Amino acid sequence: MTSRDVARAAGVSQATVSLVLGDKWRGRVSERTAGAVREAAADLGYRPNLAARDLRLGRTRTALLVVPALTNEFFARVHTGAARVAAEHGFGVVIYPSPEGVGRARDPFDSSRTALDGVIASSMAADALVAMRAGGLPLVMLDSDPAGPEAAATVNIDVADGMRQVTEHLLAQGHRRFLHLAPAVDSWTFHVRADALAGALRAVPDAAVRTETSALTVDAARQAAERALTGPGPRPTALVCDDDILAAGACKAVRRLGLRVPEDVSVSGFDDLSLATAVEPELTTVRLPAEEVGARGMAALLAVLENRPPESVALPVELIVRGSTARAAD
């Protein structure tokens, strides 16, 4: 069975069959014709020899997904979304960890610069992009500066809106003394969150915020929150955390100091990981569409590889109000 048989059954040319089965028909072939080709191929039991075609085109049908940590649930969800879309198009996804997401990444192309078709990089610090660009492959950035020159496409989450939603929720609860617990990571996404928090509080004359940074671990966050809560000046009544892991550490700090969440101190997170409902009280947090981020990232890479304009998106987020926030005590 060959593509010629499919073309004859569908009443089209072999070139049209190649376009449709190679998923390059959009803008060249009508949906009706594409459907007829797929139906004819299915009826005849025809499957194109992708390996031969890819060898001819110099393709490996493999994408590299760069994430800061393999153990982080958010990035596991990103991979799930990317792998699902990749599988639908006959691609595979290889995961490459860039530990902590900071500093210069080890060059992933050292072993073979021809074993990949493109790179999707998630929430990377700026310095870690050097090796990615050195590979000379199409790069799609996730949750990164859309104005940056490094990427062929970007897929973003509206983290600024998420931070504004959290801040407005806490302001409505009467909070005016804020602590921002931020990761010690030089990343665009965290700068955007900090700017959004500061901007939302700037319009409230009696509101104040100070920032404490921490490594992205529960214990480091606990120590940072303890320092902030026992430091000089009035104690913050609201701890705004850039990640649910940081928020879990902040909750531990509050309890160790003999205080209560949320009666004495409200705590909010970001991501809506499984951890958010595993702690007590459950975390008020911002739900990020991690799986959709991965799916859109893979779709954008496929568009770049097929010389189609990738879709620029800023995916919406949702504030999830749970038990860790309440009205300010004073």
Where are these regions (language model features)?
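Generic beta-sheet signal
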Residues: 122, 142-143, 157, 181, ...
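N-terminal helix-turn-helix DNA-binding module of bacterial transcription factors
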Residues: 1-58, 329
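Hinge/beta->alpha junction and helix N-cap segments in small-molecule ligand-binding domains
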Residues: 50, 67-77, 95-104, 154-165, ...
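Periplasmic-binding protein-like
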Residues: 115-123, 177-182, 211-212, 232-243, ...
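Alpha-helical recognition/docking segments in bacterial nutrient-uptake
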Residues: 57, 62-168, 172, 234
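Flexible loop/turn connectors
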Residues: 230-330
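Short beta-strand segments enriched in small/hydrophobic residues
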Residues: 14-19, 55-69, 169, 177-184
